[in-house]
């Protein structure tokens, strides 16, 4: 009986040891996606916004050429990875059923080193993401909504 419990405990501990890195890796890729592409409530959406957020998010050493920020709530973005707010799109991607308010920051000027100067384009777009385990981990593109 005691030996059976020991084996069961060993299997349980080994199972715990194998599971967290996978979950942690999924969460770190999702967290990285949020850092690069999510800003719930932007303060302005012009070149000053782009220069400020790109610097705060660590995307300016060297200056990133282009980056899109999705505005709204995380639940709606996560729902793209499900049928609630997403449809299959090309190979292993999902496209949002609804459009999102987005700001695209594009590097303006010749130098790839700070101070980085950006131009902002704001609008409503459907977004295309790659998902892993039900979480968005890569923003592939954003598509302007047709009127």
UniProtKB/Swiss-Prot annotation:
What is the residue range of the motif Nucleolar localization signal? 55-59
Q: Which residues carry this modification: Pyrrolidone carboxylic acid?
A: 25
Q: Name one GO molecular function term.
A: heparin binding
The protein's location, in the record's own words, is: Secreted; Nucleus; Nucleus, Nucleolus; Cytoplasm, Stress granule
What are the positions of the active site?
Answer: 37, 138
Q: Name one Pfam family in it.
A: RnaseA
Entry EC number(s): 3.1.27.-
Asked if the keyword Disulfide bond belongs to this entry, the reply reads: yes
Summary of the function given for this chain in its UniProt record: Secreted ribonuclease that can either promote or restrict cell proliferation of target cells, depending on the context. Endocytosed in target cells via its receptor PLXNB2 and translocates to the cytoplasm or nucleus. Under stress conditions, localizes to the cytoplasm and promotes the assembly of stress granules (SGs): specifically cleaves a subset of tRNAs within anticodon loops to produce tRNA-derived stress-induced fragments (tiRNAs), resulting in translation repression and inhibition of cell proliferation. tiRNas also prevent formation of apoptosome, thereby promoting cell survival.
Return the protein name: Angiogenin
The organism is: Pan troglodytes
Question: Quick one: which gene encodes this?
Answer: ANG
């Amino acid at each position: 009986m005691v030996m059976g419990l020991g084996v069961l405990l060993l299997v349980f501990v080994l199972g715990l040891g194998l599971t967290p890195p996978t979950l942690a890796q999924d969460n770190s890729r999702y967290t990285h996606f949020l850092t690069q592409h999510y800003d719930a409530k932007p303060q302005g959406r012009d070149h000053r916004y782009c220069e400020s957020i790109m610097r705060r998010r660590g995307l300016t050493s060297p200056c990133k050429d282009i980056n899109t920020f999705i505005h709204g709530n995380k639940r709606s973005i996560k729902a793209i990875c499900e049928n609630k707010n997403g449809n299959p799109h090309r190979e292993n991607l999902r496209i949002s059923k609804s459009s999102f308010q987005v700001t695209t920051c594009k590097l303006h000027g010749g130098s790839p080193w700070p101070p980085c100067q950006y131009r902002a384009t704001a609008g409503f777009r459907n977004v295309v993401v790659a998902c892993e385990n039900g979480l968005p981990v890569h923003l592939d593109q954003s598509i302007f909504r047709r009127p």
